[in-house]
Swiss-Prot record:
GO terms for molecular function: ATP binding; carbamoyl-phosphate synthase (glutamine-hydrolyzing) activity; glutaminase activity. The keyword Phosphoprotein does not apply. CDD domains: GATase1_CPSase. One of its GO terms (biological process) is 'de novo' pyrimidine nucleobase biosynthetic process. Its EC number is 6.3.5.5. Residues 191-376 form the Glutamine amidotransferase type-1 domain. The gene is carA. Small subunit of the glutamine-dependent carbamoyl phosphate synthetase (CPSase). CPSase catalyzes the formation of carbamoyl phosphate from the ammonia moiety of glutamine, carbonate, and phosphate donated by ATP, constituting the first step of 2 biosynthetic pathways, one leading to arginine and/or urea and the other to pyrimidine nucleotides. The small subunit (glutamine amidotransferase) binds and cleaves glutamine to supply the large subunit with the substrate ammonia. It is an enzyme of class 6 (ligase). This is Carbamoyl phosphate synthase small chain. NCBIfam families: CPSaseIIsmall, PRK12838.1.
Length: 376
């Protein structure tokens, strides 16, 4: 079915919908991963975005039950050069087109993804529309320009849970706190409150592997509630949108950083930066993919990392921290640790899913920091 992709600057490409009729809009970005499309689709950090995969053939291994990073598809639309309809994978439960159609998400193929990626790299990520409903290119460009920009958008409210839950190893399970806010921690490990701003499930798996006893909470959970729960440390997850909009969350994080160990990944890294007095800015086209080189300044090692962010903490803006990681492509901040308090964070994704596992030591580093701070 004939479909068009129109960007706000008037750049228009024609392709074919592989999920039926429809129209969708959002910020158009590109991802340089060769594999891992299922994890991309189910990553809540992609809310509000239409993702172009730079690799030319996507869908070869279908969709599996084991490779989800959340319970649904979060991208606004999926843009590929060619979509495979006959996957070859013994684990596959359905094809990529069927999966997107099941979740009501538009997919477009036949697009010159090299031309689109080059355009976005030169001109920056921008708003766009994909539609099968009209071939009026000027009208589609007008619709793209009417969409909200990513700056100023709080998208966490679209993907975060409303109530606390526990992680059973495969899926979230609801929990009930006592009237006074206390939580009956089921395990014997360090008691960790995990803020879910749009968390990827592999983060929960790896925190569990480190021996933490987890209570996962919504963004509205206050520092006072954290204390009442009996938590000993706090972890801030990834998530979508502009971190500068989350002023209430930053206020509560600031309180928690004065009381207990705190770590963050991606959006959590940005929120910690704000809580400690720093600022953030929007990157031209973001970092999206699983082949980004990062240098760990603590060890001197070079890591290939998985990344997905459109905003970045200004590298000189956060007081009283040691810069621990930098991006070797553009020199942007990839991680910091506080000089006197048990606080650390990274911008990239050490849990990967998809991507390399070079940075997975971050979870052990956090576990060691908590052990030193709380004595177990």
């Amino acid at each position: 079915m004939r479909a068009f992709l129109a960007l706000e600057d008037g750049f228009v490409l024609e392709g074919r919908s592989f999920t039926g009729r429809g129209e969708s809009g959002g910020e158009v970005i590109f991802n340089t991963g060769m594999t891992g499309y299922q994890e991309v689709l189910t990553d809540p950090s992609y809310a509000g975005q239409m993702v172009c995969m730079t690799y030319p053939l996507i869908g070869n291994y279908g969709v599996t039950a084991e490779d989800m990073e959340s319970g649904k598809v979060h991208v606004e639309a999926f843009i590929v050069k060619e979509c495979c309809r006959t996957p070859s994978n013994w684990r596959a439960i359905m094809s990529l087109p069927d999966y997107l159609a099941q979740h009501g998400v538009m997919g477009i193929e036949g697009i010159d993804t090299r031309a689109l990626t080059r355009h976005l790299r030169i001109n920056g990520a921008m708003r766009g529309i994909i539609s099968t409903e009209t071939d009026d290119r000027d009208e589609l460009v007008r619709r793209a320009r009417a969409l909200p920009t990513m700056e100023g958008q709080n998208l966490v409210t679209r993907v975060a849970p409303a109530t606390p839950y526990r992680w059973d190893g495969t899926r979230p399970q609801p929990v009930q706190l006592a009237a006074d806010g206390a939580y009956a921690w089921p395990g014997t490990g360090p008691r960790l409150v995990v803020y879910d701003y749009g968390i990827k499930w592999n983060i929960l798996r790896l925190l569990t592997d480190q021996g933490f006893d987890l209570l996962v909470v919504p963004p509205s959970f206050t520092a006072m509630q954290v204390a009442a729960s009996g938590a000993e440390a706090v972890f801030l997850s990834n998530g979508p949108g502009d971190p500068a909009t989350l002023t209430d969350e930053v206020r509560e994080i600031r309180v928690m950083t004065e009381r207990m160990p705190v770590a963050g990944i991606c959006l959590g890294h940005q929120l910690l930066g704000h809580a400690l007095g720093g600022t953030t800015h929007k990157l031209k086209f973001g970092h999206h993919g699983c082949n980004h080189p990062v240098k760990d300044l603590v060890t001197g090692h070079i890591e290939i990392s998985s990344q997905n962010h459109g905003f970045c903490v200004d590298i000189e803006s956060v007081p009283d921290v040691e810069i621990t990681h930098v991006n070797l492509n553009d020199g942007t901040l990839e991680g910091f640790a506080h000089k006197t308090r048990p606080i650390l964070a990274v911008q990239h994704h050490p849990e990967a899913s998809p991507g390399p596992t070079d940075s997975r030591y971050f979870f052990a580093r956090f576990r060691g920091m908590v052990r030193e701070a709380v004595g177990r």
